[in-house]
Amino acid sequence: MPTPTNTIIKTSIVSNLPANFKHIGNEGTVSNGLTTQTDSIVDEISNKLASSWNTFASSVTFDNAMVIGLGIGAWVGNGVGGIFSNTELSMNATNPFTGGKAGDLTDAINSALNEQFNLWASTYLINGVSFVGTSTALPIVPGVFTANAIPMLISAAGFGTIPIGSGLKIIANLPFITPDLTSFCNAIGDAFESNFNNWLNTSQLNAGSATGPAAPGAGSGFGLSVGGTLL
């Protein structure tokens, strides 16, 4: 499944705001009930998060899982471990206005969401992903195996540190806080986490391919995976 769009993220943020949210700024409202200033900030956050998320998912590879298995002719194995080639989500929302405190807010959001996402990416390991392929080994002659991973949901293929408490992390990064800002930061954190979990549970990881020596007898062998991608 593709990464969440800016529209999906924005809708999630707005839907997580409490009914008594009094908005940031004093301008007139737009169709979703937010003030124009609040709406501009939500647009900036949604656009930058969606863009950076898509860049991560479309460019990252997953490599270096240990693949162990066996087979004469047909070869079957399992992969564990591995690492993403890039563990950096680089969201960079900026202040849509001249001056004011909105820059402190966008900086706090960038820092918290990047930290949360990148902690997951840097700790993610696959666990028992199936690799299937062929082996040239014979009962008395060594050979080589080549195998490809069977794509699995990211959440089922492995595990990493799932983001929690993102709104609180945003709040902790702010040099100032008000009740409305608390609601706003929590709405952003909740929207990020719900979209993150949906992405994990609907998108797939192709853990790549592996090749290596296959011993005579059962054709046992091991190698490191390369070229895994997010689908």
Model-identified regions with their sequence ranges:
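Extracellular "spike/adhesin" assembly and maturation modules
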Residues: 1-231
